Amino acid sequence: MNLGMSSAILSKLPRVGLALLLGSNLGMALLFANPHSAMAGVITLPDGGRCEGELSEGKLSGSGICQYANGDRYEGQFINGKPHGQGIYTFKEEGRYQGEFALGEFNGKGVREFANGNRYEGTFKNGEFDGTGTFTSTNGIRYEGSFTNGSPSGRGAFTFSNGTRCEGDIKEGKVNGKGVCQYANKNRYEGELLNNLPHGPGIYTFAEGGRYEGQFSEGQFHGKGVREYPNGNRYEGEFVKGNTQGQGLFTFKEGGRYQGPFDNGEFSGEGVREFANGNSYKGTFVKGKMSGKGVYVFKNGDRCEGEFSDGQFNGKGTCIYANGDRYQGEFLNGQKHGQGSYLYADGTKVEGNWQQGQLQK
């Protein structure tokens, strides 16, 4: 084809297609165009990339496509040679972005899909997640809320792969501050969090009943607190890494209580146990049971002092009875057993060997 083709044919062609029809370079195309009007053309970038689309004053303005030298690709709107408006940017190896652009950056609403399967949908500012959005990762973590400079910040909620959902104040990409966590087992926490875990004062409510209110550390009961159990029992005192540890008061629903030291959830050390029937024990406990030196007082006034083991009066001891009688000797499982002497209130005294509470003749 040559420039001698009929003027009638040329007059029917749109101006935006003239450069491509003539097969000329961009400079020749501009000879036939209004320098301030849009026309179609091709631009070769300094690094070898190639762009084509609507041109104005030698720059892409309007719809266009750029294939960059690094393998990335953009298709969408341009202003003054930069992506601006709606478009799709496809990375050679890092997924793609679809949404709004401003002056060459992701700006406004959009969707960023990563090659590893991670996905963000929301608002962008200068190429970063910024504003409100949702980030979903392939490892099962989902975040909905506010972002600043590419990271979760402000108010938001994390949903983890195990079903736990925590929402609240977001700092440094995690829930740090006041928040609420709903767990997969239907348990619930409300209070202070650090790095998505209960930390500081808070309340933990169990789905099956009962609750804990007090101090937490790295997701565990730690410090002073109150634990109410579903069976009605109650503990108030110190906790260490989730267990009752240190000084505390344990109250039983049916009556009675224990006050003293705990070790790994059990009565341990010098404490006082008051029973629902009115009896009481003051002395040493080991693994939750009376064991060691102690004094056991019955509701009726009987009093036994001596050695205990496995929750029973075992070993040497003395019992002073409410009627004035007195026994001193050996015991087994709470009964007189072994050598002992029995002094009656009237002064009568018997000594001998006892078996299961009975004097042997």
Map each language-model feature to its residues.
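Threonine-centered tandem repeat motifs in low-complexity domains
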Residues: 1, 44, 65, 88-90, ...
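Ala/Thr-enriched low-complexity intrinsically disordered regions
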Residues: 102, 115, 123, 132-138, ...
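C-terminal segment of classical bacterial N-terminal signal peptides
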Residues: 23-37
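Bacterial N-terminal signal peptides that target proteins for export
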Residues: 3-24
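Conserved anchor residues at repeat-unit boundaries in beta-strand-based tandem repeats, strongest
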Residues: 51-60, 73-84, 96-107, 120-129, ...
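Short N-terminal segments immediately surrounding and downstream of signal-peptide cleavage
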Residues: 37-57
